[in-house]
Amino acid sequence: MKRFLSLFLSLILVVLFTVSFSQEIPTKIYNPKIQKVSQPLYVAIIWHNHQPLYYDPDQNINILPWVRMHAIKDYYDMAYILKNYPQVKANFNMVPSLLYQLELYTKKGIKDKYLILAEKPAEELTLEDKEFILRRFFDVNWDRIIKKFPRYWELLNKRGQSIDDVVIAKAIQNFTVQDFRDLQVWFNLAWFDPDFQEHDKELANLIKKGRNFTEEDKKLVIKKQYEIMSKIIPLYVELQKNKQIEVTTTHSFTLLCLFL
């Protein structure tokens, strides 16, 4: 993500520089008396960050984990990368339903079902817990992410690349307590942006370790997730105050801002 965004921003700067300083271009093919006068090219960079409202007030939990997962994968890192290019301005569409759920995690102590089961000690998992984990803790791109991590890929193949009831029932019997604990860790560890995986020493050490994780390892991964989530809103506020970004928003999801 960092390499892609850096390359994209560099390309924008090159285009702006080239267009701004280009000479007048004659258009003799159409009319030798008419010349095109080059004008600055104005480019609006808009990052659309949204999440539906997953919060269920009846259960007092977030039903799905995608606010948390994209927080550690995209929302912080994209703004942090932009901060390193102060001459580049951008717009971020941060919908209130996303900001609200970030605060549910960081200030209200609300969790999602995936997080609750990830935090649960592996030896205490029920059959229902194990079934859910085996079905849902591989919900990340298999080719680009899971395959990068040998143990995670091993666990996927041990489960089977299907969520058929027969396959899951067999996997429940075949998975050891350690297998379930490693899966709990890997699902949460693999979602981190590669910058965190490479440059955060504690996360890098866990990735290097690869298997036989402990409950303490799992707690560390979750702690890191909360640290990142708690920094997201302050970072965007800082960039907005410095006039490097503008924030556009609607409550939940919109395409209108992309058309303006």
Model regions and ranges:
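Short, glycine/serine-rich, charged loops/turns that create anion-binding
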Residues: 12, 50, 252
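Short, well-ordered beta-to-alpha junction loops that form the rim of enzyme active sites
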Residues: 94-97, 251-253
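Structured, charged N-terminal subsegments at the starts of enzyme catalytic cores
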Residues: 223-254
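Bacterial N-terminal signal peptides
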Residues: 8-16
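Alpha-helical scaffold elements lining the catalytic groove of polysaccharide deacetylases
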Residues: 256-260
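Positively charged n-region of N-terminal signal peptides that target proteins for export
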Residues: 1-4
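Sec-dependent signal peptide cleavage junction
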Residues: 18-29
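N-terminal regions that are enriched for targeting/export leaders
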Residues: 30-90, 97-220, 241
